Amino acid sequence: MSEAQPLVTPKPKKSVALSGVTAGNTALCTVGRTGNDLHYRGYDILDIAETCEFEEIAHLLVHGKLPTKSELAAYKAKLKSLRGLPANVKAALEWVPASAHPMDVMRTGVSVLGTVLPEKEDHNTPGARDIADRLMASLGSMLLYWYHYSHNGRRIEVETDDDSIGGHFLHLLHGEKPSALWERAMNTSLNLYAEHEFNASTFTARVIAGTGSDMYSSISGAIGALRGPKHGGANEVAFEIQKRYDNPDEAQADITRRVENKEVVIGFGHPVYTTGDPRNQVIKEVAKKLSKDAGSMKMFDIAEALETVMWDIKKMFPNLDWFSAVSYHMMGVPTAMFTALFVIARTSGWAAHIIEQRIDNKIIRQSANYTGPENLKFVPLKDRK
């Protein structure tokens, strides 16, 4: 367990709207209270990221506690049973063109599932948790059923016997069970992405939930928010930056020139963390292990070289997205699916926040600072020029 550090109050960032504003209460997560820490329901991310399976973290967030050995076995069996897709959902996914972004596919899949298996009108908590479990179990099925059908006309079987959500995703993607290293790497990355307090997509989910809307609508809205390159899409952009270079020296020279020209480099800095992203040290080690296992250090070395330059020149640290891009690439995940994996993980956090917002039972309605014109004289339509 990490030692307690003094709490800090980060300065609001001009580039982030509402930075530093407290918008509500949560018992789910704390971010950056000492500058570089992250806790899920009181547990330090550095204690659980590599030691827990993703299903343990999902149980912690959605069901309120870390499971016992028997509870975990039962939970994994439940999730495994929820991987299948209703025929209507498959039919809808077959209409989505191959050119669609995976995030749009997942948003569509969630919406269709919400019409086929709608939430009960009373929005009871056990039912909400069941929906969250079904979504975490089947989001990979939705994406990869669409992917194989739209790209090569294959209707794949999505119900595999893989032990984990991450293993299930990789199995459907590649058509074979992943190695233990890949499955462990996927578990760790999903753990790191699972929850992050009042970020844009989570707050979107809470705003929707606060209106009394259903779980599917709240999750769909969150997916829409996460799709943006300033939020979840950052890991895709990060890899596009990394892959344009052939070697670390070329990367360092070019990025130095770009930074000097005031270009923003996606994958560095964070709206809340002030001294570093605690998730980076974990995912960087994952990326390194995967690269060594593949016998190809090129992308890792380039990413690390860029990390050094950004710190030396700008004193900016990499966030989770930077080395997760390398990790997913080394496991053969298409770049456009990077953020989709984020969705699978973050659904656990979103669902927990939706349930928490429902318990609070208040609509979220903030005020705006008006900056428009005042006291204009009305001109009837016939007199306007």
Curated annotation (Swiss-Prot):
It comes from the Bacteria. Its EC number is 2.3.3.5, 2.3.3.16. GO terms for cellular component: cytoplasm. SUPFAM superfamilies: Citrate synthase. InterPro entries: 2-MeCitrate/Citrate_synth_II, Citrate_synth-like_lrg_a-sub, Citrate_synth-like_sm_a-sub, Citrate_synthase, Citrate_synthase_AS, Citrate_synthase_bac-typ, Citrate_synthase_sf. The lineage of its organism: Bacteria, Pseudomonadati, Pseudomonadota, Betaproteobacteria, Burkholderiales. Belongs to the citrate synthase family. Homodimer. Substrate binds at K78, H196, R279, R346, R365. The active site is at H231, H270, D321. CoA binds at V264, V265, I266, G267, F268. Keywords: Transferase, Tricarboxylic acid cycle. It catalyses: propanoyl-CoA + oxaloacetate + H2O = (2S,3S)-2-methylcitrate + CoA + H(+); oxaloacetate + acetyl-CoA + H2O = citrate + CoA + H(+). NCBIfam families: cit_synth_II (TIGR01800), PRK12351.1 (NF009006). One of its GO terms (molecular function) is 2-methylcitrate synthase activity. This is 2-methylcitrate synthase. Pathway: Organic acid metabolism; propanoate degradation; Carbohydrate metabolism; tricarboxylic acid cycle; isocitrate from oxaloacetate: step 1/2. GO terms for biological process: carbohydrate metabolic process; propionate metabolic process, methylcitrate cycle; tricarboxylic acid cycle.
